[in-house]
Amino acid sequence: MKLCIGLCDDNPLHLRMISQEIQRLCGMREIEAEIHTWTSGAQLLKEIETYDIQLYILDIRMPEITGIDAAKQINLIQPSAQIIFISSYLEYFSDVYETEHLYFVLKSQMAQ
């Protein structure tokens, strides 16, 4: 099985760590992961039709376009795509309900 994943986080270190964790988890389940990364919501939305992303993992707090605003556009453009929000800030938990999404995960709990 192949899973096309879009990962967006404005922190390059977090982007790399999350990408590695996704690769590890997919490897454990024998899922081939094709991961595309962006460091801004604006960059992601410019390239949204370039790839057939099945799962987006979005940081919430980013400059210009937040992960929540990006998710609203993803919901319109690719309604079958699934979305997981990640954040270091619990204060954004209730904001994710403005969009269709699967989960909200705190970055500190990613490995669990």
Residue spans for each PLM region:
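Non-catalytic signal-transmission and effector/linker regions of two-component phosphorelay proteins
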Residues: 1-6
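Conserved sequence signature across two-component system core domains
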Residues: 8-9, 38-40, 56
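Acidic di-acidic motifs
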Residues: 9-11, 88
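Two-component/phosphorelay signaling modules centered on CheY-like receiver
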Residues: 12-36
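Helix N-cap/capping motif at the beta->alpha junctions
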Residues: 37-43, 67
